[in-house]
C-alpha cells in the first residue's frame, strides 16, 4: 500500500468551497498533503490546505496543469473541465470519481437517460434543446402542465429548477437545454449516501429525510434517521446501491430520491461527492462522509457508517434583504444549547439564500432533536452589517 500519511503524496482537490474545507479537517487529521484549485481568491479552503492555486475549474489548461502536480485528484463541485480530467486519466493519473462518471452527472438529461438505460426508477421526462422546442412540446401535448422544468446544466441548491403551471411561467424561463419532468406527488424527499472504494467495497449510510424551504427550493433540515417505515428505508437503500453499481463510481455518491404516496422510490438526482445530506455525520456517525470519501479514493478500508446518535442538520443561509459583510446574529445563544454544533463556512459576504454554514443537533430522541432544530432555526440569523 502507498504511504499517504506524513509523506510526499499529494492529493489534489478541484474546488475550494465549504465541502473541500470540511474534507480538509480529515486530511489534517491524517497529515495528507493537499493542493486546492478554486477561482476565488477568498475560497474557504485557502486557510486549511497546504497549497492553494487560484484559477478556473472550467479552463482545460488550468485543470490539466494542476492535475499533473498531484498524485490523486478529486473534486468537491461538479462544474469542472472533464476533457482535462480524461487526458490526465489517459496519462495514468488517478481521478476519482472518473471523468466518465462526472460527464454523465454534469448533464441532467444525460443523467436521466442513464437511469432509464439501467432500469433505475425515476420520474418520466422529456429532453428539449431550447425554449422554442419546449414550447412546441407543450403545444403538441408531449408535455402536460404542470411539470418540473430543469436546466440540464449548472443548476444547484434549487437554482435551475422551476415548477411550470402556465404559458406565462414558460415565458420567464431562460433559453437553454432543459428537461420537463413529471410532477411527483410525494410523501417525503429522501437521500442515501453510498461510498465505494477503488477495490469495490461498498457501504451505505442510513436513509435521511430532507425538508425543503418552500420558496428557495433548498434543503432546510436533514433528519437522520428518516422517520419512515423500515420496509421503505430498505427499498431506498436497495435503489441507491443499484445506482452506485451502475455508475461504478469511486468515493461518495449522494442519491436523492422521492418516496411517492404509494411508497415507491424514484431517483431524483445524484452528486458524486460529499453532500449536504451527509453533514450530520460529522457529529452523529462513527465515520463522517468526508473521511469516508478519502478512505474510498485512497483505497483504504471503509469505516463504519452507522450513527452513534440521532442527528439533524439545519442549513444556515443568508437572510432575505441582506447583502454584504456577514454577521451571525445570536450564534452565542444556540451555542448554549445542549448537543448543538455550528459550522461556519468562511464566506465573508452574505446574500439571500446563500449557504453560509450549518448547525448539527444530536439527541437520542429524533423528535426532540427536531424541536431543538426548529428553535435553532428561529434563533440564529445570517445578516449583513
Set out the residue ranges of the language-model regions.
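Short, flexible turn/loop "capping" segments at secondary-structure junctions
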Residues: 45-46, 152-153, 350-354
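Active-site nucleotide/adenylate-binding loops and adjacent lid/helix of ATP-dependent enzymes
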Residues: 104-191, 195-243, 377
Amino acid at each position: 500500500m502507498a504511504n499517504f500519511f506524513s509523506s510526499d503524496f499529494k492529493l489534489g482537490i478541484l474546488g475550494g468551497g465549504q465541502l473541500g474545507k470540511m474534507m480538509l479537517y480529515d486530511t489534517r487529521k491524517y497529515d495528507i498533503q493537499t493542493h486546492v484549485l478554486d477561482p476565488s481568491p477568498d475560497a474557504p479552503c485557502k486557510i486549511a490546505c497546504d497549497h492553494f492555486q487560484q484559477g478556473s475549474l472550467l479552463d482545460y489548461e488550468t485543470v490539466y496543469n494542476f492535475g499533473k502536480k498531484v498524485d490523486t485528484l478529486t473534486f468537491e463541485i461538479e462544474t469542472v473541465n472533464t476533457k482535462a480530467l480524461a487526458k490526465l486519466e489517459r496519462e495514468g493519473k488517478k481521478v476519482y470519481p472518473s471523468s466518465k462518471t462526472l460527464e454523465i452527472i454534469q448533464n441532467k438529461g444525460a443523467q436521466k437517460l442513464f437511469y432509464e438505460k439501467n432500469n433505475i426508477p425515476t420520474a418520466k421526462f422529456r429532453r428539449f434543446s431550447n425554449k422554442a422546442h419546449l414550447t412546441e412540446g407543450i403545444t403538441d401535448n408531449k408535455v402536460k402542465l404542470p411539470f418540473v422544468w430543469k436546466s440540464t446544466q449548472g443548476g444547484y441548491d434549487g437554482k435551475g429548477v422551476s415548477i411550470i403551471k402556465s404559458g406565462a411561467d414558460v415565458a420567464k424561463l431562460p433559453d437553454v437545454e432543459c428537461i420537463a419532468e413529471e410532477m411527483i406527488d410525494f410523501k417525503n424527499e429522501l437521500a442515501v449516501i453510498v461510498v465505494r472504494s477503488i477495490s469495490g467495497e461498498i457501504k451505505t449510510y442510513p436513509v435521511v429525510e430532507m425538508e425543503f424551504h418552500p420558496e428557495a427550493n433548498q434543503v432546510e433540515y436533514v433528519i437522520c434517521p428518516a422517520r419512515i417505515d423500515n420496509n421503505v428505508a430498505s427499498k431506498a437503500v436497495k435503489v441507491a446501491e443499484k445506482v452506485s453499481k451502475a455508475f461504478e463510481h469511486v468515493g461518495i455518491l449522494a442519491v436523492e430520491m422521492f418516496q411517492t404516496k404509494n411508497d415507491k422510490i424514484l431517483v431524483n438526482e445524484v452528486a458524486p461527492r460529499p453532500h449536504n445530506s451527509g453533514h450530520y455525520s460529522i457529529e452523529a456517525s462513527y465515520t463522517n462522509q468526508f473521511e469516508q470519501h478519502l478512505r474510498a479514493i485512497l483505497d483504504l478500508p471503509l469505516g463504519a457508517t452507522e450513527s452513534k446518535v440521532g442527528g439533524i442538520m439545519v442549513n444556515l443561509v443568508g437572510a432575505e434583504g441582506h447583502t454584504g459583510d456577514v454577521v451571525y446574529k445570536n450564534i452565542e445563544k444556540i451555542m448554549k444549547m445542549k448537543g448543538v454544533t455550528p459550522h461556519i463556512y468562511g464566506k465573508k459576504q452574505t446574500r439571500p439564500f446563500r449557504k453560509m454554514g450549518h448547525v448539527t443537533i444530536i439527541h437520542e430522541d429524533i423528535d426532540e432533536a427536531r424541536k431543538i432544530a426548529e428553535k435553532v432555526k428561529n434563533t440564529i440569523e445570517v445578516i449583513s452589517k
